[in-house]
A protein has these predicted regions:
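Acidic/aromatic-lined carbohydrate-recognition and catalytic surfaces
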Residues: 2-163
Length: 164
């Protein structure tokens, strides 16, 4: 396949961002979900969109509105199931709508298995995936603040959590 304009579709595409939690609730629980998104695909197509930028729907404790991912290979139950996700892909494709997943790679949840393993030992293979500093309980390594307020450090030995 050549690297022609076909591979650069995004340069002129209309991309519609969907924050699933508040987009469309399909089951009356007050939380938007994947079936709700599917129910609006015809409307989105009429708007003339080319792609959906889907904010995180991965499993998460929701401390950072889904950006604190605890499992990149599973869907957050409040949004639906993996089968719902597969249906969304299939239905969007039928309508010529692309799906772009918001993939958060610069941090994980403190409930992610890598972090849980990393906390066990400085020798753990996952330990270097995170920022750690030696310290004493109650004394922070520096004055860096979290995006959510307060110190970016939490005693565990000490790890930085700039987000949640």
């Amino acid at each position: 396949m050549s690297m022609g304009n076909k591979n650069k579709w995004w340069k002129n595409a209309v991309v519609y961002q969907i924050y699933p939690k508040s987009f469309q609730d399909s089951d009356g629980d007050g939380i938007g979900d994947i079936p709700g998104i599917i129910s609006r695909l015809d409307y989105l197509k009429k708007l003339g969109i080319d792609a959906i930028w889907l904010s995180p729907v991965y499993r998460s404790p929701q401390d950072d509105n889904g950006y604190d991912i605890s499992d990149y290979q599973d869907i957050e139950p409040m949004f639906g199931t993996m089968e719902d996700m597969e249906q969304l892909f299939a239905e969007a494709k039928k309508r010529g709508i692309r799906i772009m997943m918001d993939l958060v790679l610069n941090h994980t949840s403190d409930e992610h298995r890598w972090f849980l393993e990393a906390k066990k030992s400085k020798d753990n293979p996952y330990h270097d995936y995170y920022v750690w500093r030696d310290g004493e309980e109650g004394i922070y390594p520096n004055d860096m603040n979290s995006a959510f307020g307060g110190p970016a450090w939490e005693w565990a030995v000490s790890y930085t959590h700039l987000r949640a």
